[in-house]
Regions:
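Non-catalytic, solvent-exposed interaction/assembly segments
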Residues: 1-133
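N-terminal "pre-motor" subdomain/linker immediately upstream of P-loop NTPase catalytic cores
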Residues: 39, 57, 98-192
């Protein structure tokens, strides 16, 4: 295939094929690629074993400055982190509490897309499982094993898959499963 026109024909690019198709021309080592959360893409590659890679939203320098402002403002704040992967998924779906959102809105001046990126990273670092958050969002991960120098995950279809994580904080929460959820009635409200 050539990128130059020959005769009266215009150059064409072949139609994309699924990553696991043996004739795929664009990423032969990619076995699976999915967006697990807005802007968060997971790729499973196969070379010498499986590799589980996470691509998170890209922060501009202005977004990074805004994130640092938010993180320094909330440094020492009592924001409870989820105790399980299920809790992390719920937290990411709900976002910050309204009072925290108002504070962040006052602190951050950026585009709506930049605001979403900053909110994602702030949620991960302040109110979720840090660098483990995107892994918690992928419901295809069945098991996570901590080795001497990395974290290895087992997905429904690919195992073991090495990750870029070495010794992440909150790994015990990531590995925990919610057994049940209980509430207590108080003044007409259900308190978890």
């Amino acid at each position: 295939m050539s990128g130059r026109a020959t005769g009266g024909r215009r150059p064409t690019v072949p139609a994309p094929l699924a990553p696991d198709d043996p004739d795929a021309w664009y990423a032969p080592d990619v076995r699976e690629q999915d967006e697990i959360h807005p802007g968060v893409v997971v790729t499973v590659r196969q070379a010498d074993g499986f590799r589980y890679e996470v691509r998170e939203p890209v922060l501009s320098s202005r977004d990074r400055d805004a994130l640092e402002t938010v993180e320094s403002h909330f440094d020492g704040a009592n924001i409870e982190r989820p105790r399980t992967r299920e809790g992390a998924v719920e937290r990411m779906e709900q976002g910050f509490d309204p009072k925290h959102r108002r504070v962040i809105d006052r602190l951050v001046e950026c585009s709506p897309a930049g605001r979403r990126r900053v909110a994602y990273y702030a949620l991960c670092s302040l109110a979720c499982l840090g660098e483990l958050t995107p892994y918690a969002l992928d419901d295809r991960i069945d098991v996570a094993d901590v080795t001497e120098d990395s974290v290895v995950v087992h997905t429904e279809d690919y195992a073991p898959a090495t990750t870029a994580l070495s010794d992440p904080e909150f790994i015990e929460r990531f590995a925990s499963e919610r057994v049940g959820r209980h509430t207590v009635s108080f003044q007409g409200f259900e308190i978890p």
